[in-house]
Amino acid sequence: NRNKKSISIDLKTEAGKAIVRRLVAEADVLVENFRAGTMDGLGLSYESLAELNPRLVYAAVRGFGDPRTGTSPYAEWPAFDVVAQAMGGIMGITGPDRGQPLKVGPGVGDTVPAMLLTVGILAAVRHAERTGEGQFVDVAMYDAVLALCERMVHQHSYAGEVPGPEGNAHPLLCPFGMFA
């Protein structure tokens, strides 16, 4: 956060919305992480802001995706790290005991989606530089955590296996573990 300048804006007031619109008119990127539909309900949807600035890259982290880019029965649900870890499946493969879900130490449900969103933002900014056209970019926290479980998804999809907690072991590599 070096050299970062922060402001607080009340988005529920017309004055606050006017400030956002004025900032967006000059901005390259807007990042938000409200539930799907929140900014739309405030009159600050991607579509309305893109009218003010066609080069705008509007980036959103959602718990379970955005209706603009796909459908999810959970799209309206709020989410945070531990919810993303549980729904994404990583808690089911972490720790030593089956039946006792364990969250991963770091907040991967928050940080991994943010890193993936950064990649999307960089690509969209590059596109805007070349074409003058902004984009809506979103990352679902659920999808990002599920991507961390890629081997488990393949095991289930192709072999019908339901992977469980592995502790310090690895089901495919040997020797593998903690040795003193």
Predicted regions and their residues:
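A structured beta-alpha segment of the ubiquitous adenosine-cofactor-binding alpha/beta core
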Residues: 1-51
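Acidic, glycine-rich segments within the central catalytic cores of soluble metabolic enzymes
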Residues: 85-180
